[in-house]
Amino acid sequence: MEKKKYNISVEATLEVIGGKWKCVILCHLTHGKKRTSELKRLMPNITQKMLTQQLRELEADGVINRIVYNQVPPKVEYELSEYGRSLEGILDMLCAWGANHINRVYGDTFSVLEESVLNDKLKQES
């Protein structure tokens, strides 16, 4: 593997978790294992193709584990790997920053956020 060159280390971070969907996927996986269909339901605006691509990239980077159960019909779940769990603090801070940003721009965080487990957690903390 050829070594890459980065100007600053955050470039390496964004190479792994950057983009529109990866942090959202990771946030959902902080709440436990999820099947692809569960993730799709939690993120209705992502296409199936994009979800599959993002999951493959996160798995290739060692951030998530793909668990294949030997059964019929086939069952596959995704979970944060031990390495991926090291991102939980960062993901929590990103969620908190986003809530503050929404509140600053719109005045009320919860009038803008959709109903979800992640947002219920945020409501309990405020």
From Swiss-Prot:
Domain HTH hxlR-type positions: 8-106
Keywords assigned: DNA-binding, Transcription, Transcription regulation
Residues annotated as transmembrane: none
UniProt key word DNA-binding: yes
Pfam families assigned to the protein according to its UniProt record, in alphabetical order: HxlR
Record bears the keyword Cytoplasm: no
Superkingdom of the organism of origin: Bacteria
Gene Ontology molecular function: DNA binding
PANTHER family xref list: TRANSCRIPTIONAL REGULATOR, TRANSCRIPTIONAL REGULATOR, MARR FAMILY
Protein name as annotated: Uncharacterized HTH-type transcriptional regulator YtcD
Protein's organism: Bacillus subtilis (strain 168)
